[in-house]
Amino acid sequence: MKTKIIIYICIWATAWAIPVPQLVPLERDIVEKSADVPFLAHPGTAAQNELHINNATNDDSPKGSELGRQVHSNGGYERDRNGSESIAVGGKSSPTQPILANAQGNSAKEREDVETYGHDGIHAGGENSTANGIRGQVGIAENAEEAKESKVHGQPHQDTKTGLASDTSQNGDATLVQENEPQVAGSKNSTNHEVGTHGSGVAAQETTPQREGEGSENQGAEVTPSIGEGAGLDNTEGSPSGNGIEEDEDTGSGDGVGADAGDGRESHDGTEGHEGQSSGGNNDNRGQGSVSTEDDDSKEQEGSPNGRGGDNTSSSEETGIEEGDGTQTTQDNQNLSPTEGGIISQAEACPSGQSQNQGLETEGSSTGNKSSITKESGKLSGSKDSNGHHGMELDKRNSPKQGESDKPQGAAEKSDTHNNMGHSRIGSSSNSDGHDSYDFDDESMQGDDPNSSDESNGSDGSDDANSESAIENGNHGDASYTSDESSDNGSDSDSHAGEDDSSDDTSDTDDSDSNGDDDSESKDKDESDNSNHDNDSDSESKSDSSDSDSDSSDSSDSSDSSDSSETSDSSDSSDTSDSSDSSDSSDSSNSSDTSDSSDSSDGDSSDGDSSDSDSSDSDSSNSSDSDSSDSSDSSSSDSSDSDSDSKDSTSDSSDDNSKSGNGNSDSDSDSDSDSEGSDSNHSTSDD
């Protein structure tokens, strides 16, 4: 027995001992091989990028310091070149730097390359480059503040004109590297990249926004650092595309981008610029929240027909939002103006993207006070253009349908892209269901289209937005909306389609408009109250979120009816920021709201959205009463201005109530119920 036991033990010991040496070396070999493979592949690839990036970034971090010094001292081209060196953070410092310094066209191309390489390098060496780039960005942000405090406003405009695109792309890559961590950093430069990542409008948006303003890239640069500095973006966009001074930029782009850029430029202007900064900067921050969200749909919108047109605008803008928000805002803050500097401050202050959304909306709203209505029109579709711009941010998220919506208002590609999008999508954006709301909005818009005769006035989403706009606008001051929006927004013809009816009815008979346009629409709303009122409550969901946003945005709309409308869009875009954007929009833009209650159509629009949904619902029931009060407010643009202020505040309250579901009594509650129903329907539609 002992012998057997000993033999057994020996056998067991040998059996146990033999595999161990075999398995251990095999595992070691496997581990070593596998370790070697990742280290070779990952560091090999990343190491190159990281080498370039880290070298460029380490160089650029000092260069960022030098940037600050040189930018502060030199103000202009050294910023560009240091910006190029910052782009060198992207990894292609020398080619990028000379080319960017050499030409904007090259800087656009280079920007693409820099985006490509820099973005890859950034992703590859993103951590190091992000850390270093963040250092550089800190230096840049500080330098941007210095620059913005320094002659940044003056010289950077020159730089903006001359080297803004390059400077922006440079800053974009630098900032990308800097803020590559958030992927919004990727969105910065990589909004083109990220757009490229999305792949819908990759080359188109990279190339087109770059071509458009070369501010896409610049905007891409902007996007991440500020995270949604639509002003900076628009500045970038307006600057490169406009290649003009702030004001020229304002008209320089000529596009919605130009308007946005112009508004951003106005933000550069430092007058509206700072105001646009405050609302614009805040809006930009809000816009940036939109940016991230939008960027997802930004690719879609980029994929959209207007993804090219509107996306060049929108994409540039949204790239500007996504892309252009941060970096160029950073160095546009350095380069462009204290406004964008303020935007950076606001962007830094509001990195959440809340204020940036407003800024984008604000800038987008510079596309038109349309935009300011947009938020409401987002609900109202009336400010489709400005909504378009803001909707762009929003539409970026939901751009495919936006593309559909874009088509009707193709003239205002951004706004058009955003109009329908802005309308349904703002609601959807507001409904942080963005896509869900949007799809539901499109569907409900389309559903409203059949349901509501007004919605058949124009295109599907546009008319839906329009009829909803008209409805809401008809009630909430289609006259004022139409007066503001109709006057401002020729391309609100869709909105005017319902809105002129509504506007005529509203201006002639606001109650009739509410009863007629809005009543029929509202009765369609009431009949299709779930569909239209789902739209309405989609709008009211938008009014719920969007009205909150719209409220903030309406407040924002009222604040910068154009800016705020885009802010409302950005508010809508910032669904997460939505409440915050309601706070920011409502607070910042509400102050502006009361200020720019002159955009009472916005206030009215928000009222019109909430109250006019209210009036629409109430309008069917109490069409002349609610609609009288609403339409009175709405029809009295001035009264609705005052009312817009109070009602904007009320609209804020009622939109907050709308968020609460209390709404403007009937329709807001209904809309809120419908809004939740429509939110459910949003989800359902999207589902």
Swiss-Prot record:
- According to the record, the residues making up region (Disordered) are 54-113, 146-687
Q: What is its main location?
A: secreted
| Compositionally biased intervals (Low complexity) | 447-460, 555-598, 618-639, 678-687
Cite the record's Basic and acidic residues compositional bias ranges: 146-160, 262-275, 386-417, 522-545
Q: Does the keyword Phosphoprotein apply?
A: yes
**Glycosylation site list:** N55, N82, N128, N189, N312, N369
One GO MF term: collagen binding
Q: Where in the cell is it found?
A: Secreted, Extracellular space, Extracellular matrix
List the induction conditions.
Answer: Down-regulated by the CEBPB-NFE2L1 heterodimer during odontoblast differentiation.
Q: Give the UniProt keywords, A-Z.
A: Biomineralization, Calcium, Extracellular matrix, Glycoprotein, Phosphoprotein, Secreted, Sialic acid, Signal
Q: Name one GO cellular component term.
A: plasma membrane
Summarize tissue expression: Specifically expressed in teeth, mainly in odontoblasts and transiently in pre-ameloblasts.
One GO biological process this protein is involved in is:
cartilage development
Residues annotated as carrying Phosphothreonine in the record are T57, T319, T329
Q: Where is the composition biased (Acidic residues)?
A: 500-521, 599-617, 667-677
Q: Where Phosphoserine occurs, residue numbers?
A: S226, S253, S278, S292, S298, S315, S337, S345, S366
Q: Where is the signal peptide?
A: 1-17
Name the residue ranges with Polar residues bias. 93-107, 161-194, 276-292, 352-375, 418-432
- Which post-translational modifications are recorded for this protein? DSP is glycosylated.
Q: How does it assemble?
A: Interacts with FBLN7.
State what this protein does: DSP may be an important factor in dentinogenesis. DPP may bind high amount of calcium and facilitate initial mineralization of dentin matrix collagen as well as regulate the size and shape of the crystals.
Protein name, per record: Dentin sialophosphoprotein
Which species is the source of this protein? Rattus norvegicus (Rat)
The lineage is: Eukaryota, Metazoa, Chordata, Craniata, Vertebrata
